Regions:
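Transmembrane-helix signature of 12-pass secondary carriers
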Residues: 1-195
Length: 195
């Protein structure tokens, strides 16, 4: 059960890694679609860090007042909102706002998940279990790169999907699918926190 709790909390690290790395596959299409200049490109890539700062500043306060699990639930909600919002953004401003929301999730989870693991772990295994969080961050990076690669390969294959909205997300504007795919692990994180 201790390992399960640690893996659940470490899933927050996966989301941190995914959210941080997924942006790399989206820059070219987002730049073209919204006709971004280099300053706007930088803002698009870096705006999540603003949210991260906010998340880090409030993570300790939230976790002390609401508890570690409730704060991780808030983080999962922020990640889900960000991923879904990015996938359906109508303009650049909306996209940036949702990226900042995801950044808040990054900031919160980067404090609370390792803290939670260290509190539930017995001293004998604490170091190993807390390291699961960092491993999950790295796996999140890899996951984002693999998802980006697969979605881009599918989009470039010329295959079309039968529903227009799916076609838009996974073929014509595949960056939406890349950002939106984070919804799946975020919802999983949200659900399994309750166990």
């Amino acid at each position: 059960y201790l390992i399960f709790l640690s893996v659940v909390a470490a899933l927050g690290g996966f989301l941190f890694g995914y959210d941080t790395a997924v942006i790399s596959g989206t820059i070219a299409q987002v730049t073209q679609l919204f006709q971004l200049d280099t300053l706007q490109q930088g803002w698009y890539v870096g705006c999540a860090l603003i949210g991260s700062i906010v998340g880090v500043l409030f993570a300790g306060i939230l976790s002390d007042k609401l508890g570690r699990k409730m704060t991780m639930i808030i983080s999962a909600t922020l990640f889900s909102t960000s991923a879904l919002g990015c996938a359906i953004s109508a303009d650049f401003t909306q996209l940036v706002v949702y990226r900042i929301i995801g950044g808040v999730g990054i900031g919160v989870v980067s404090i609370v998940s390792p803290l939670y693991i260290s509190e539930v772990a017995v001293a004998q295994y604490r170091g190993r279990l807390v390291s699961l969080y960092q491993l999950a961050v790295t796996v999140g990076f890899l996951g984002a790169y693999l998802i980006n690669y697969q979605l881009l390969a599918y989009a470039e294959s010329g295959n079309q999907l039968s529903m227009d909205w799916l076609n838009k997300i996974f073929v014509t504007e595949v960056w939406r699918g890349m950002l939106g795919m984070e919804t799946l692990p975020a919802v999983l994180f949200f659900i399994i926190i309750f166990f």
